[in-house]
C-alpha cells in the first residue's frame, strides 16, 4: 500500500515578501469564492469536475479564445497560472461545501442556524515545482520561491533551517517530494513537503495484530486508542 509522510522545513527569518504573497493569494480566494457563489447555478449543472473547473476558470481568466466575465485578471495581474488554478480549486471547494450544507439545512426543516458562505479564509499557497519553486544548490540550505513583492512576482532565494534540511537529507534523500505548501505556525513560516512510498503490509492475522486508531476532533485534541 502507499503511505504519505510530510515534514515542515522552517524558513529562516529574512527580508522576503512571504506575508504579501499570502495576503494576495487569500484575497484571490476570497474574490473567487464570491464570484462562484453568484455563478453556482450555472456551474453546478456541470457534473464532470474537470469541465466544471474549466468553466470556472473561463469566467475569470481572459485568453485569446476566451473573454472573462469577471475582472480577476485586472485585480490580480500577472498571478502565476498554477497559483491562480490553486485559488480557483479552493474557492470552488468552499462554495460547493456551502451549497451542500444549505441543502441539508433545508432538508432538515431549517431547524439549526442557517449556513453562511464565508469569504474570509486561511488558504495556503502551493509552490509548484519549476514555476513557483526551485531547489537550491545541492548541499546548501536554500530554495527559490516565486513571491509577490507588492508590485510583481519575482524569484527570491530563501534560507532554510539547517537541522530540518539535514533531517530530509538523512531520511528522504532520493525520494520524490510533492510540491511544497506554505505553512504558518507560531509566527514562523514553513515549507511542508509530502513524500509517498510503497509499504508492504504485515501478513500477521488480524486477531494477533495491535491496531492503533486515531480520532481527529474538530474542536478537540486527537484521541488515540
Region annotations inferred by a language model:
Residues 1-225:
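Nucleic-acid substrate recognition interfaces
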Amino acid at each position: 500500500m502507499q503511505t504519505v509522510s510530510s515534514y515542515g522545513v522552517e524558513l529562516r527569518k529574512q527580508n522576503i515578501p512571504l506575508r504579501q504573497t499570502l495576503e494576495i493569494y487569500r484575497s484571490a480566494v476570497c474574490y473567487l469564492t464570491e464570484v462562484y457563489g453568484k455563478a453556482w447555478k450555472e456551474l453546478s449543472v456541470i457534473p464532470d469536475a474537470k469541465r466544471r473547473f474549466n468553466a470556472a476558470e473561463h469566467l475569470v481568466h481572459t485568453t485569446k479564445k476566451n473573454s472573462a466575465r469577471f475582472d480577476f485578471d485586472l485585480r490580480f495581474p500577472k498571478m502565476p497560472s498554477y497559483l491562480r488554478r490553486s485559488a480557483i480549486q479552493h474557492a470552488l471547494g468552499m462554495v460547493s461545501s456551502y451549497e451542500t450544507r444549505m441543502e441539508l439545512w433545508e432538508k432538515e426543516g431549517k431547524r439549526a442556524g442557517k449556513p453562511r458562505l464565508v469569504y474570509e479564509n486561511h488558504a495556503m499557497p502551493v509552490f509548484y515545482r519549476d514555476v513557483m519553486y526551485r531547489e537550491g544548490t545541492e548541499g546548501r540550505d536554500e530554495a527559490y520561491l516565486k513571491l509577490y513583492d507588492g508590485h510583481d512576482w519575482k524569484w527570491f532565494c530563501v534560507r532554510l533551517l539547517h537541522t530540518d534540511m539535514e533531517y530530509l537529507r538523512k531520511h528522504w534523500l532520493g525520494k520524490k517530494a510533492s510540491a511544497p505548501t506554505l505553512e504558518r505556525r507560531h509566527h514562523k513560516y514553513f515549507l511542508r513537503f509530502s513524500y509517498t512510498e510503497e509499504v508492504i503490509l504485515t501478513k500477521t492475522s488480524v486477531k494477533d495484530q495491535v491496531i492503533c486508531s486515531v480520532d481527529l476532533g474538530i474542536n478537540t485534541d486527537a484521541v488515540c486508542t
